[in-house]
Amino acid sequence: MLDVQAIRKDFPILDHKIYDKPLIYFDNGATTQKPRQVVEKIENGYYNVNANIHRGVHFLSQAATEAHEEARKTVQHFLNARSSNEIIFTRGTTESINLIASSFTDECMSAGDEVIVSVMEHHSNIVPWQIQAARKGITLKVIPMNEKGELNLDEYRKLFSDKTRLVSVTHVSNVLGTVNPVKTMTEIAHEQDVPVLIDGAQAVPHMKVDVQDLDAEFYVFSGHKIYGPTGIGVLYGKEEWLDKLPPYQGGGEMIATVSFEKTTFNELPFKFEAGTPDYIGSTALAEALRYVDRIGIENIAAYEDELLRYATAGLNTIEGMRIFGQADHKGAVLSFLVGNIHHYDMGMLLDRLGIAVRTGHHCAQPLMHALGIEGTVRASFSFYNTKEEIDTFIAGVERVRKMF
């Protein structure tokens, strides 16, 4: 059982008031708040261990390098990757997917080849492939979903052809909360000798992720979704795949030798990390992962599921309530509309009550089109949220409903 009140003391922002109301932060799907330990790690890095890494013989550079590479090992162990060489630091999920979209397409795809995505993808797992489609003539195929917001695996199987080169799919929908059966989907793809990329941005903060068990070739996530800083993310890739893909960007550190006639590239993981990396961000991300480990990801998953069920039951008592996403296995995300109230109006009025939710299409316009709506109100929960906050939230939604 989590000691939620003790946890909340690590997050000073939760003590803030908005319009003289206690802040209720239900926008964790967009970004999470940061515990003191992570903020202090950033502060300590800049105050005491700030030097460019990998390139200096002096003490500070070596200390910063050691901290950065230890952070890489922390990520490796958190994901249960086989080697730290399989952990590439990026700016976030979006850059990680763009990296694979560019390098994989260059190495493994020709005009007419196909990538399979799902109807519930975030734009960051659609647009990079569309850019490659325009550049190289590849084609996107889309997995449909049923009325509950679950992917149709029978239709998924039918999408494969001799032109299919990659499956790129979200682990957890940022709108519906659906937890997709990505292990089964990976097995299906592997039956066709097709590699898999999984967008784990909404999964890693909320459930145990074991990349060796999932067996996908690539797995990506962002630090800021899991209590770490913005601007740092992770691309996990099986070493044999990262070895054969070309670099995404050129510059310092990703090279072995350079002449005007030829450049040879560095070994993994540095081949994909051109320029000065965010060595402060990497150590802060590692601190965030250690924080989550101390609480226990299984404890987090169980508690957030309890919050989800409690909030779902409460919202369903409200007249005109429509909750989008009724999958049997969901993450701590609730997207909804009430009657004819515009999602923006609901969000603005909840904000006046101190309640932070997200409104709009949530960077998933194709999914909104499939649902026949323009957008939703989204409440997304964390382990520092409480049932008392949910009670206030439900009362707030009901109060707004009565205004229209």
Language model features with spans:
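Pyridoxal 5′-phosphate
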Residues: M1-F404
